[in-house]
Each structure stands twice: as structure tokens, then as C-alpha cells.
Amino acid sequence: RRIAMLEGLGYIYTPSKNNSFLKKNILKHAHGLLASIGYAFANKVLFLNQDDLVDLAKNSFINSKKSKVIGPIGLELSSYPYTEVVITKPVRFIFVGRMLAEKGIFEYLAAARIVKLKYPNTEFVILGGLDHDNPSALSKDQLTHLISEGLVNYVGNVSNVSEWLVKSHVFVLPSYREGFPRSTQEAMAIGRAVITTNVPGCRETVQDGKNGFITPLFDEEIMAEKMIYFIENPEQIISMGNESYSNAQKNFDANKINPILERLIVGGS
């Protein structure tokens, strides 16, 4: 059996603020043709979210009977044990990911500026590396300036992401598109509320108003409003974090997900 699994559709399906619509449209058709050929002999084509399946189907000839949405691949939850939030001042928000426009780094920074006008002691942590070869990336000079003005606490690439999640109050991922973000799953497993965007892959992780907030794409003002809500209502950091933990236990346990994948691989439906 041949199984294809797409963990996301990548750059050409990701919205952007520049005028790249025509270019991406052409690339979508080219990608769809290649996908039609490449997956023609696959018994199953697996997707992590429904939008990816629908969007690729619009631009390809993949047999719909082969396509299936499986949701998150999941985590070894014991590696991300629940740790109750300790509500201390200042409130600390955390971004984990490459510092690219498509990951929402610029919206995160813009929201931080808005929040700090009202609550200047609020902390904004960034985990992740610079991407010097990507034109949409935050530059080293920009980062140096942000650090010097005290806007962010830049940690860089680390091997102990979970420890930083534990030390933070709210996880923020303003991404433009995802498959099913592992970083959000990790934060939820530990018991952290989430602020994310209303885009494929991200909106599947949050029940708006229950374990966090879903904000419009590109809208740093609404994002800042939600951050301020947590600052002014710290009890919601705990209750929404607990809801995240509950969702993670139900939906992100690799020990429950792996047998389902195994059945698909060996011939089940």
C-alpha cells in the first residue's frame, strides 16, 4: 500500500500582504497537476485539516474517495505534562516558531506595542531562529532594535521549549496557515490558553472563548485586545488553560492516534 500524507499545503496556499495572488494562482495549478500525477498510485491521501483537502481538490484531479482528513498527528503527552499556571505579574505571552511574516511574527510584534502602551511591564517572549535567506523574515537588525528597546525577550532556538511554555501564561500563534500546528498542541497539553488566527490548521485548535481566542488574520489590534483581556482577567488564563489541557487529552494523544494511522496504512478505512 502507498499512503501519502500532507502536513500542510505550504507557501502557495498561504495568504500574504504583497501582490503575489497571480503568481500563487499559477503555482497552485502547477502544483495541482504534479499532485495529481504524484498521488495517482496512492491508496490513501491523508490531510491534517479539511481546508487543505478542499483547496487541493479545487486544483487537482485527486480521487476524492482516496482523500481523508485525520486531524493532528498528536504528541507523546507524557513529554508535555500539565503544569498549572501561576498567575504572577507581569503576564507573559510566548511565540514559538520561525520569525517569518507567514508565521505572524510582525502581527505579534505590533500587538505587543499596542499592549505595552497600556501595560508596559507585559512580557513578550520569542522562541525560534532567524531565517537569513527568506525575504519575508524578520531581519537581524530589526531584531536587535526590538531587543534594545525592550519590546521582546528573544530566546532563540532552544531544546527545552516545554520549560519556556511552562514559564509563560498565554501561547500566541498568529500564523497565516498551518497543517495542524505542533507548537499549539504542546502549549495546550501543558495547559496554556491560546490566541491564534482564523485560518486553516489554527482555527481547529481553539474553541473561541473557551480555551483561548481566534482572531482575524492580519489584525494585530484584535489580537492586542485579547491579550489585554487576559491581563485584566487573569482567572481566565487558568480556566482557559485548563480547557486547553482537557482538549489536548482528548484529541492530541499519540497513543490513541497511532493505532488509527496504523489501520489506515495496513488497509483499514
Show where each model-derived region lies.
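Nucleotide-sugar donor phosphate/pyrophosphate-binding loop at the beta->alpha transition
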Residues: 1, 11-38, 54
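Donor nucleotide-sugar binding/catalytic pocket of nucleotide-sugar-dependent glycosyltransferases
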Residues: 32-82, 95
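A conserved mid-protein helix/loop that constitutes part of the nucleotide-sugar donor-binding site
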Residues: 91, 95, 100-114, 124, ...
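Short hydrophobic beta-strand element within catalytic cores of glycosyltransferases
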Residues: 193-196, 206
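Conserved acidic donor-binding segment of nucleotide-sugar-dependent glycosyltransferases
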Residues: 207-209, 213-220, 229-235
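Aromatic "clamp/platform" in nucleotide-sugar-dependent glycosyltransferases that forms part
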Residues: 157, 176
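Glycosyltransferase donor-sugar binding loop
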Residues: 96, 123-138, 154
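A short, well-ordered alpha-helix in the C-terminal region of glycosyltransferases
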Residues: 222, 229, 236-251, 257-263
